[in-house]
């Protein structure tokens, strides 16, 4: 068993429970442990038939950000691979064999992700080009999934080589809920690792786009963008991609 899963619930206990039931129904042999973080108070999970999978529940006294929660979960990780997952994913098949095949079969592969689909069967644009103001506008007008050569992968499902995650010290906790995925992909690649979206596997994401409805979420999103665009890793990563002819 090779993988530790990290799932963070922001009061999404019932949604997360459906995903946990999907995972336990499939009983993926590669999954050793699930670390479930309740970021805000919620009802206890019911008794679950975990089989070979160990469940660890963390309850935060005060809410933490995306990166902080997953970094805390990683401190419990004793497996060679660490998977960050949103609680609103659904699984029809086990995605991990194909992901591990790419992750273990490619030298210096630090991160992989599956293709992500909406419940209606639409491919989501979760494999993206460098996060610039121009690219952000382009994606809003004409969403495209750059699965062949992505510069970053969206954070709803990220399977890391634990050595890579540890080497770059995980997520930057200076962000809060947004842009942590963009930042960690940039730093991972600058550290000499690579990333990929694996076309042979997929999961469904039943997204709740709160940032489109809440001023508070919008403020966090804009703050994350400004933080990223003013940091050295953004400029270094952009320069590297330009030299490689990918910009």
Task: Indicate residue ranges for each PLM-predicted region.
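Short aromatic/hydrophobic "clamp" motif used to bind/position activated sugar donors
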Residues: 82
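Short, flexible, basic/aromatic active-site loop/helix in glycosyltransferases
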Residues: 130-151, 155
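Conserved donor NDP-sugar-binding/catalytic core segment of glycosyltransferases
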Residues: 93-124
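Active-site-adjacent helix/loop segment of glycosyltransferases
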Residues: 6, 186-247
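N-proximal low-complexity "stem/linker" segments adjacent to membrane-targeting elements
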Residues: 1-22
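Glycine-rich, basic loop-to-helix element that forms the pyrophosphate-binding segment
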Residues: 60-77
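Short, acidic, metal-binding catalytic loop of nucleotide-sugar glycosyltransferases
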Residues: 22-31
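A short, conserved alpha-helix in the catalytic core of glycosyltransferases
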Residues: 152-202
């Amino acid at each position: 068993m090779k993988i530790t899963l990290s799932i963070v619930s922001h009061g999404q206990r019932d949604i997360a429970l459906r995903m946990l039931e999907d995972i336990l129904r499939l009983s993926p042999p590669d999954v050793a442990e699930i670390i479930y973080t309740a970021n805000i108070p919620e009802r206890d999970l019911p008794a679950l038939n975990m089989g070979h999978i160990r469940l660890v529940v963390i309850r935060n006294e005060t809410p933490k950000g995306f990166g902080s929660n997953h970094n805390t979960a990683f401190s419990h990780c004793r497996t060679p691979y660490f998977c960050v997952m949103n609680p609103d994913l659904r699984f029809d098949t086990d995605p991990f064999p194909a992901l591990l095949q790419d992750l273990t079969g490619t030298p210096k592969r630090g991160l992989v992700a599956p293709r992500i689909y909406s419940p209606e069967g639409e491919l989501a644009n979760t494999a993206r080009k460098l996060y610039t103001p121009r690219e952000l506008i382009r994606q809003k007008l004409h969403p495209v999934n750059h699965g062949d050569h992505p510069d970053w992968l969206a954070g709803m499902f990220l399977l890391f080589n634990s050595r890579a995650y540890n080497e770059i010290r995980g997520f930057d906790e200076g962000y809060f809920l947004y842009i942590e995925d963009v930042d960690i992909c940039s730093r991972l690649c600058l550290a000499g690792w690579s990333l990929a979206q694996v076309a042979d596997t997929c999961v469904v994401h039943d997204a709740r786009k709160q940032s489109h409805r809440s001023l508070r979420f919008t403020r966090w999103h804009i703050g994350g963008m400004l933080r990223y665009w003013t940091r050295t890793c953004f400029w270094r990563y952009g320069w590297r991609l330009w030299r490689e002819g990918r910009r």
